[in-house]
């Protein structure tokens, strides 16, 4: 019986929720910087019988039989990622970016070793030393921030803290920073104190693959990333390195140190994603992602809203609402009512709690996949400001929602109207 089961017939409640989410994605504008729309080919790979196969170990060195075909799948993903990023070593087994980071900690550090990373309210990630995360609970985490007034990474502070605390590992990377990171400066600082340099490029991996953002691979000892976001693949993770000196440690940290069997259907989807990213049109897409972000930033700033660091050189921006005396939670709700999805986000020295915040983060990967150009991105930024200026006024929200519905029909996600 199970061979013929369909979700619609067997589990209509689940089917209804899934269908509703498909409708939401088609009819709402997605501006969460970490979200994107993957291709039908990526989704097709994830929905195959590869999901049935257990394959502990690595290609050619498995603990289970019957892995000759999944070995081909995983090796394809590895080889394509190496070509895409110019890395000598790649591990495509991490289930997420956080698990990739966790594996690097396990490979390179001992418990209570000192790590230096960007603080959450400056734009860092939980796994960069936040006190509520494994990286802050199990290690001595020291945090750097931004230059007050400019919103740029305070490299002098990074250097000063590195000299003072002698970290075993320095983490460069971010989840809410809109400028270009100076990877070479981080390398210099790491070398000064004899630290490993880990770069978490999760947010900008697609931009790097597309040649519109500098690559950290020549500078870092280890690079981690997710494979969704700007890379437009499945929700998963990956580890890269510039040479194979650390390969054995990293492989052992992923399996058996941090995970059991890899998700072969997801690894197949990564292989598809990397092949897509090697195409010439992927570069054009990434160029448009940045153009759209800059078009939005200009309108938002012209309308009187502050963007931390004064603009954007990548796919995202962090908007401070302190001057407007509104919270990120309010803005998130008001824009959501207009069918524009963003996320509330802390700003530097945020007086509000992480559940409320004083800012919102927006990004352009998803709208660019959808087909937005600079003019349409600028219009969208204006609609956002209209809703915020009105503090969620029902009439203004309804007017903007109508505009959102119209452009969503004009630019469907998967070339079909729901």
From Swiss-Prot:
<dbReference type="InterPro" id="IPR001085">
    <property type="entry name" value="Ser_HO-MeTrfase"/>
</dbReference>
<dbReference type="Pfam" id="PF00464">
    <property type="entry name" value="SHMT"/>
</dbReference>
<keyword id="KW-0663">Pyridoxal phosphate</keyword>
<comment type="subunit">
    <text>Homodimer.</text>
</comment>
<comment type="pathway">
    <text>One-carbon metabolism; tetrahydrofolate interconversion.</text>
</comment>
<dbReference type="InterPro" id="IPR039429">
    <property type="entry name" value="SHMT-like_dom"/>
</dbReference>
<keyword id="KW-0028">Amino-acid biosynthesis</keyword>
<feature type="site" description="Plays an important role in substrate specificity">
    <location>
        <position position="228"/>
    </location>
</feature>
<feature type="modified residue" description="N6-(pyridoxal phosphate)lysine">
    <location>
        <position position="229"/>
    </location>
</feature>
<feature type="binding site">
    <location>
        <position position="120"/>
    </location>
    <ligand>
        <name>(6S)-5,6,7,8-tetrahydrofolate</name>
    </ligand>
</feature>
<dbReference type="GO" id="GO:0004372">
    <property type="term" value="F:glycine hydroxymethyltransferase activity"/>
</dbReference>
<keyword id="KW-0808">Transferase</keyword>
<dbReference type="InterPro" id="IPR015424">
    <property type="entry name" value="PyrdxlP-dep_Trfase"/>
</dbReference>
<dbReference type="GO" id="GO:0030170">
    <property type="term" value="F:pyridoxal phosphate binding"/>
</dbReference>
<protein>
    <recommendedName>
        <fullName>Serine hydroxymethyltransferase</fullName>
        <ecNumber>2.1.2.1</ecNumber>
    </recommendedName>
</protein>
<keyword id="KW-0963">Cytoplasm</keyword>
<comment type="pathway">
    <text>Amino-acid biosynthesis; glycine biosynthesis; glycine from L-serine: step 1/1.</text>
</comment>
<feature type="binding site">
    <location>
        <begin position="124"/>
        <end position="126"/>
    </location>
    <ligand>
        <name>(6S)-5,6,7,8-tetrahydrofolate</name>
    </ligand>
</feature>
<comment type="similarity">
    <text>Belongs to the SHMT family.</text>
</comment>
<dbReference type="InterPro" id="IPR015422">
    <property type="entry name" value="PyrdxlP-dep_Trfase_small"/>
</dbReference>
<dbReference type="InterPro" id="IPR019798">
    <property type="entry name" value="Ser_HO-MeTrfase_PLP_BS"/>
</dbReference>
<feature type="binding site">
    <location>
        <begin position="353"/>
        <end position="355"/>
    </location>
    <ligand>
        <name>(6S)-5,6,7,8-tetrahydrofolate</name>
    </ligand>
</feature>
<dbReference type="InterPro" id="IPR015421">
    <property type="entry name" value="PyrdxlP-dep_Trfase_major"/>
</dbReference>
<dbReference type="GO" id="GO:0005829">
    <property type="term" value="C:cytosol"/>
</dbReference>
<keyword id="KW-0554">One-carbon metabolism</keyword>
<dbReference type="GO" id="GO:0035999">
    <property type="term" value="P:tetrahydrofolate interconversion"/>
</dbReference>
<comment type="function">
    <text>Catalyzes the reversible interconversion of serine and glycine with tetrahydrofolate (THF) serving as the one-carbon carrier. This reaction serves as the major source of one-carbon groups required for the biosynthesis of purines, thymidylate, methionine, and other important biomolecules. Also exhibits THF-independent aldolase activity toward beta-hydroxyamino acids, producing glycine and aldehydes, via a retro-aldol mechanism.</text>
</comment>
<dbReference type="GO" id="GO:0019264">
    <property type="term" value="P:glycine biosynthetic process from serine"/>
</dbReference>
<dbReference type="InterPro" id="IPR049943">
    <property type="entry name" value="Ser_HO-MeTrfase-like"/>
</dbReference>
